[in-house]
Amino acid sequence: MQYKKSDFYYDLPEELIAQTPAEPRDCSRLLIYNRATGEVKHEIFRNIIDSLNAGDVLVVNDTKVLPARLYAHTQNGGTVEVLLLKRLNKDEWEVLVKPGKKCTVGKKLVISEELSLTVKDITPSGERIVKFEYDGVFEEIIDKIGSMPLPPYIKTKLQDKNRYQTVYAKHDGSAAAPTAGLHFTPELLRKIKDKGVIVTEVLLHVG
């Protein structure tokens, strides 16, 4: 069977897009589809435990989201949005920039008194390879001045950075959260393990 992109278009009213996370995390909604019977059930996320059995393997991604969105300034006073994508070495990163026309090779951008960057190269798909110059510890500077890269359909300001992290996040590197995991709580994970489900971690940076 051949598919067209239009086959996957659907209407999603803005008023149905949650602008703040559910509290507690595991009270969000969950859709369960039974492939064998075709049954569709609407549940509360914490009830996912009822669909898991002893010996099942639950794989979670323990990547941690960086506050990867930065705002830089050109020498002419223009503003450029910089999104960290991938660390290439100690000081060089692959980043997305907007607008791109202000970020030609050799261009220097100032982000703060402690942090600046120089554009070293442009990839075939338009990302920039940049080298950062900084005074202090890079990760500490980013944590202080960066903002969480929320999806464009989230319009409200994130009040607590930890709500865009999973409770098992360990390894810095993502530019977006593995969102399916945001709904687990420590208590729910404990109950799942107590039921005999094997919980194993993988590391896959998102973004």
Model-identified regions with their sequence ranges:
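A cross-family signal for N-terminal binding/gating loops and helix N-caps
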Residues: 1-207
